Amino acid sequence: MSDANNTAGDANEVNPEKDLSAENLPGQRGQGGEEIRVQRGMFGANNGGDTSGYGGLVRSVRLPGPASRPYGGWFDEVADELEGALEEQGLLPDNAIEKTVVDRGELTFHIEREHLVRVARTLRDDPALRFELCTGVSGVHYPHDKGRELHAVYHLRSITHNRLIRLEVSAPDGDPHIPSLVSVYPTNDWHERETYDFFGIVFDDHPALTRIMMPDDWQGFPQRKDYPLGGIPVEYKGAQIPAPDQRRSYS
């Protein structure tokens, strides 16, 4: 009976290497972090004939702020090893890492763009880190995040240590350049082309940065939030389907 109780007790103990439930709880939106805009009305639209009352909604739009030590679980181990490895290369961690975010049980390093390649190579090659795989890059457009409107988010996986982190890099609309990581993670080739195609982020030193989804002569970048609703007519089974901005309105 005693052994059974001990076994049950062991099973119920929290394993800090695997259980980050406290950080994994959804944070309360609008509390803490960095406010980038105030959204009014439902879905940000407040000039319609709303009679529901939702047009009066006011919501603070925030990005997660920097976390404080200890981060929890293995996050501190990764952060310590990364900072130590950068120092060994003569690079001060504070000059390379803009901030470290722990949000919803996930670890994200915000990196100064000029140091992105060195940080990524360190994460890949250091034996205690060994993030061998980058599963892709995602683009994000925050028009109200002044001076850093364009974000590129890299998702790194350590197969050796079974860990997942992110690197996030920002650039202003007026200078949308971020170093390419194809030299470190060759599988990013098409992902960076797609992010360029849809968001207009220019990945410097990419071997062939051309559009991958849209026609070569397409104007603009369709997934940016300032991209106008529009398009071109499409022929389908002999019928012409008008572009979205030319279709009949039923409202």
From Swiss-Prot:
Subunit structure: NDH-1 is composed of 14 different subunits. Subunits NuoB, C, D, E, F, and G constitute the peripheral sector of the complex.
Keywords annotated in UniProt: Cell membrane, Membrane, NAD, Quinone, Translocase, Transport
Organism of provenance: Streptomyces coelicolor (strain ATCC BAA-471 / A3(2) / M145)
SUPFAM superfamilies listed in its UniProt record: Nqo5-like
Similarity comment text for this entry: Belongs to the complex I 30 kDa subunit family.
The protein's Enzyme Commission number: 7.1.1.-
Domain of life: Bacteria
InterPro entries: NADH_DH_suC, NADH_quin_OxRdtase_su_C/D-like, NADH_UbQ_OxRdtase_30kDa_su
Name of this protein: NADH-quinone oxidoreductase subunit C
Keyword Transcription: no
Entry GO MF terms: NADH dehydrogenase (ubiquinone) activity; NADH:ubiquinone reductase (non-electrogenic) activity; quinone binding
NCBIfam families reported for this sequence: NuoC_fam (TIGR01961), PRK07785.1 (NF005856)
Membrane topology, from the record: Peripheral membrane protein
Enzyme superclass (EC): translocase
Described function: NDH-1 shuttles electrons from NADH, via FMN and iron-sulfur (Fe-S) centers, to quinones in the respiratory chain. The immediate electron acceptor for the enzyme in this species is believed to be a menaquinone. Couples the redox reaction to proton translocation (for every two electrons transferred, four hydrogen ions are translocated across the cytoplasmic membrane), and thus conserves the redox energy in a proton gradient.
Cellular component, GO annotation: plasma membrane
Catalytic function, reaction form: a quinone + NADH + 5 H(+)(in) = a quinol + NAD(+) + 4 H(+)(out)
Intracellular or extracellular location(s): Cell membrane
Chief place of localization: membrane
Chain segments carrying region Disordered: 1-34
Pfam families assigned to the protein according to its UniProt record, in alphabetical order: Complex1_30kDa
